[in-house]
């Protein structure tokens, strides 16, 4: 009888272990299916992200091309004006000067249309964000005394700094002794 109880206990234990093993196998199968689903989802997201990145790169290139085309279309009339000026180069120096001045004025209008403005020049306060000091000249300290090369900005973005001489107080000979 004791042997029978022992066999019953063993059978129950074996049955419990079998049920537990079956439950673990079912959980493992469910986890494997979930892992497969998550892996598929990950791969789809990875592909979607790669496609998004490629679209953004293409869009950026297209916008850059549009910007260049816009600038070129705006600048081509200046080339046309220069061609016309060369045709009339036989004319008097004064008419050439007037033609070049008209071309320059037209070019400034184009720049303004593109949102580009000239950096403030002579008489304005020296600003290292927009001015490059290339020398000193007698004049009001801290002010731009002379512009050697114009500077331009588009909003807060600097296209090119103005190359300027900054004013400094003229030292008297007495100060030098």
From Swiss-Prot:
Keywords: Chaperone, Cytoplasm, Stress response. It is found in: Cytoplasm. Disulfide bonds: none annotated. Gene3D superfamilies: 3.90.20.20, Head domain of nucleotide exchange factor GrpE. One of its GO terms (cellular component) is cytoplasm. It holds the Pfam family GrpE. Its main location: cytoplasm. Coiled coil: none annotated. The keyword Cytoplasm applies. Belongs to the GrpE family. Homodimer. This is Protein GrpE. It comes from Thermus thermophilus (strain ATCC BAA-163 / DSM 7039 / HB27).
